[in-house]
UniProtKB/Swiss-Prot annotation:
Enzyme kind, highest EC tier: ligase
Protein name: Glutamyl-tRNA(Gln) amidotransferase subunit A
InterPro entries tied to this protein: Amidase, Amidase_CS, Amidase_dom, AS_sf, GatA
Top-rank taxon: Bacteria
UniProt KW Zinc keyword: no
GO cellular component annotations of the record: glutamyl-tRNA(Gln) amidotransferase complex
Taxonomic lineage of the native organism: Bacteria, Bacillati, Bacillota, Bacilli, Bacillales
Amino acid sequence: MGLFDFSVKELHDKLVKKEITPFDLVTESFNRIESVEDKVGSFITLNKEAAFDVAEELGDAGIDPNNMLAGLPIGIKDNIVTKNLRTTAASKILENFDPIYDATVVSKLKNAQTINIGKLNMDEFAMGSSTETSYFHKTHNPWDLSRVPGGSSGGSASAVAAGEVLFSLGSDTGGSIRQPAAFCGVVGMKPTYGRVSRFGLIAFASSLDQIGPITKNVEDNAYLLEAISGLDANDSTSINQPVERFSDNLTGDIKGLRIGVPKEYLGEGVDPGVKQAVLDALKTLEKLGATWDEVSLPHSEYGVASYYILASSEASSNLSRFDGVRYGYRSPNAHTLEELYKKTRSEGFGDEVKRRIMLGTYALSSGYYDAYYKKAQQARTLIKQDFVNVFEKYDVIIGPSSPTTAFKIDGMINDPITMYSNDILTVPINLAGVPAISVPCGFSEGLPVGLQIIGNYFEESLLYKVAHAFEQETTFHKEKPNL
């Protein structure tokens, strides 16, 4: 049994009693990385020397009994800036970018005395569902190395599933925490929009992006979200909501819980094995005293189209800052200012990023704004209202995190429409801004299936309670890939 088979609480107790040290945990992390990283490719940049230095300092000072995360190793998605540690967003254009400040979530993790093991691979600028668009390398699913780990936070999910770190941070714009968590058999939470500061998150689509935790179990996830939540003056979209003790609400009691199951989420396009795992999960929740009814989210069918217009439009604006002038890659082949812009961006961005910039610029252009961007915003309002209507009668909404299990590497990368449609069950949640968690709920042909539990605004505590109650009745979260 490895050290990372223990929970956050168990490791904290061992650290306080000095049965183990932070140095032991960092050693465990880098030993595992040395053993499996060549197979899975979770990391872009390792933080080895600094991690051991911090571990020694914490060991010498002793672990604060009230600081649950102190001394524990974490991995950070590489679109979250870390002072003096290369942050690339998995793009050539930021290949050598060395930030001069920490993201707010990184500062909070430092205050919590976690130990940053390194920066995790992702789809370039978080644009993708498979971690295949990274400039550096593809990440492989620990459960089947011929398959993708999901995306865009594929490195964050694979590192946890492979035991390279205890937990990690990802970001979720249209499913980028929940889908990889489902594909890799781990727990991933997309918080309510505004619950966690975006300051220091390299922007993709500012009205959709949200940072969240990926862990091996629900309780660990709750501890990590407690540490990174809260109002931040540096983020105008951050909301002044009290930081709850999510971990205190894991009682297992969900008697009387009312569950809505959208017919759109278990219909055409959902793999039979995925559907069966979700139906089995609903039976487990029924045994615990919950009830469920079929409901409708009628505008979900417009989710993918609306999302890719809105997200691409915001990306075309956000990514205009990468021009070769202030920081990042600068083309050596440019002789005029216009050439500098064109060549830097043409050479620095990958194909998927360029595709989305062009799509977004087109949607925002004067002749097409009303036909595309405005209509997408109107559809977003209808999608949001669907959730409001269901939450008037039901406590949570449940369905699959993804219509399929992990697909083959190179299986969809040249078919953007099929790749985009894989997000059909996750993008409506981002468009509405509500929270959702993915928890392991079974296997289909040996590959993990994720159960998506969706809540009303700022009801993460209820999501954790339901997810934890389900987890305690099953053993799926204890299953490990054979690497």
